[in-house]
């Protein structure tokens, strides 16, 4: 009788098994997302594959598997996962956009453009496809379509300040600084594999170079260091053992999470540099760093004066810039600023700073720049 009753009970609740299976899929997807955030991309892929074993037609699981595969540089496999997500859910805007991204990385430009255009058509209020499409047009030298793409985003009210910045860069119109929203969004998107891309793919070694010079000039081990635009903490890692206090400032929360995971920083704050410095005490730091940060600010005069005020007498200000010809800073087509050496030297001449070191230096990829180390007199 009991067995018969149980059979009747389960027959009267036909959705029980499906609900349990659905919960299992959701749990696997959430586990994969957490592993992705922690940088465990192979573990994330395994979790999404478990979800797909239970639900082969789950479009989100295919999409997220694509993300995990992309982060492992398995680009063709990632493209296949995105395409499967699109087959299952043709209007999946994020899948079209990310398919375009991996196709661009695979140097399949025409296919990438088509994917981005489809993402824009399907999600006309979603900003990332406009950004990717406009940038790819820019790389291809198609400034007319790049400008039209940025203008379309502005017309729809999408992240207007950021797209105006990119449009100004495209048209050769130099502005004072990049909008905080632009810089924040840029690095929020870079955070997942920022170090690998910057170091392994672009040969970025500015933090190590700055650290070598600073260690020679200020060999004490209890220094108070302020790391402006600290990102994932590459400068903190390069200067390990040289400080008693290490403060990091950055606009991007995801980048700060990476820095926090290093357990090197005394304090980490999500803020613009200018806003944070307004409230910082005077003569509070032995060293101020700005590695690959000033490229998002054109007019550096207010920043130099503020930094000089926060340094102790004899303190060091170490930074890198991209180099421009002429006498004035310029906004480049990349959306970054470049500064002439003469312009930099005109700034510190009136701010109580003197040059200790200044030399050309490879910044990243095909970008050359200059490193300065100044001392407060």
Regions found by a protein language model. Give the residues of each.
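Conserved alpha-helical positions within TPR/SEL1-like repeat arrays
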Residues: 26-37, 60-71, 94-105, 128-135
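Class I SAM-dependent methyltransferase SAM/SAH-binding core
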Residues: 226, 230-277
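A short acidic, Gly/Pro-enriched loop at the edge of an enzyme's catalytic core
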Residues: 278-288
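A short glycine-rich, Lys/Arg-flanked "PGG" loop and its adjoining helix->strand segment in the class I
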Residues: 301-313
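Conserved beta-strand signature within the Rossmann-like core of class I S-adenosyl-L-methionine
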Residues: 314-322
């Amino acid at each position: 009788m009991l067995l018969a009753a149980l059979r009747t009970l389960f027959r009267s609740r036909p959705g029980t098994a499906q609900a349990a299976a659905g919960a299992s899929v959701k749990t696997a997807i959430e586990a994969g997302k957490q592993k992705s955030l922690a940088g465990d991309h192979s573990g994330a892929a395994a979790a999404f594959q478990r979800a797909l074993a239970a639900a082969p037609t789950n479009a989100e699981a295919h999409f997220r598997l694509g993300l995990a595969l992309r982060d492992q540089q398995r680009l063709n496999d990632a493209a296949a996962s995105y395409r499967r997500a699109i087959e299952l859910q043709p209007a999946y805007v994020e899948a079209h956009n990310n398919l375009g991204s991996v196709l661009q990385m695979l140097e399949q430009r025409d296919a990438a453009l088509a994917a981005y255009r489809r993402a824009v058509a399907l999600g006309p209020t979603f900003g990332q496809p406009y950004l990717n499409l406009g940038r790819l047009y820019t790389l291809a030298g198609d400034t007319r379509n790049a400008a039209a793409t940025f203008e379309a985003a502005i017309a729809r009210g999408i992240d207007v300040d950021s797209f105006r910045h990119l449009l100004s860069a495209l048209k050769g119109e130099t502005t004072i600084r990049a909008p905080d929203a632009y810089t924040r969004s840029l690095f929020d998107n870079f955070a997942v594999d920022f170090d690998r891309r910057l170091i392994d793919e672009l040969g970025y070694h500015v933090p190590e170079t700055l650290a070598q010079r600073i260690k020679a000039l200020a060999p004490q081990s209890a220094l108070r260091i302020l790391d402006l635009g600290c990102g994932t903490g590459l400068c903190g890692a390069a200067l390990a053992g040289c400080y008693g206090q290490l403060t990091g400032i950055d606009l991007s929360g995801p980048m700060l999470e990476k820095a926090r995971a290093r357990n090197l920083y005394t304090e980490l704050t999500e803020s613009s540099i200018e806003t944070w410095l307004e409230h910082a005490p005077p003569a509070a730091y032995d060293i101020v760093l700005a590695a690959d940060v000033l490229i998002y600010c054109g007019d550096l005069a207010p920043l130099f004066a503020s930094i000089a005020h926060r340094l102790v007498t004899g303190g060091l200000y170490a930074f890198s810039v991209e180099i421009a010809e002429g006498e004035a800073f310029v906004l480049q087509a990349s959306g970054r600023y470049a500064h002439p050496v003469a312009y930099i030297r005109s700034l510190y001449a009136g701010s109580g700073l003197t040059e200790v070191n200044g030399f050309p230096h490879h910044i990243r990829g095909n970008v050359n720049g200059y490193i300065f180390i100044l001392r407060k007199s």
